[in-house]
């Protein structure tokens, strides 16, 4: 009986994936990029392009709770898997 209970607990933990933290690429195109684990409640990675001039875009990346809006001449990509915003 104890073995069955222990097995059920292990299966539950594996299936629920308790403690999972999303990892996103963060930083700006100018200052360099790295990866970081997102804070609680931030379950989305984003990559945002902001037009700075003809054929010139500033790119920022990071974690967020909601997908940010694109600027008038920019673009945003949001995703929910590790390092999906490369």
Curated annotation (Swiss-Prot):
Signal peptide: 1-21
Record keyword Secreted present: yes
Highest taxon of source: Eukaryota
CDD domains: TFP_snake_toxin (cd00206)
SUPFAM superfamilies recorded: Snake toxin-like (SSF57302)
Gene Ontology CC: extracellular region
Keywords: Disulfide bond, Secreted, Signal, Toxin
Family the entry assigns: Belongs to the three-finger toxin family. Short-chain subfamily. Aminergic toxin sub-subfamily.
Descriptive protein name: Synergistic-like venom protein
Source organism of this protein record: Dendroaspis angusticeps
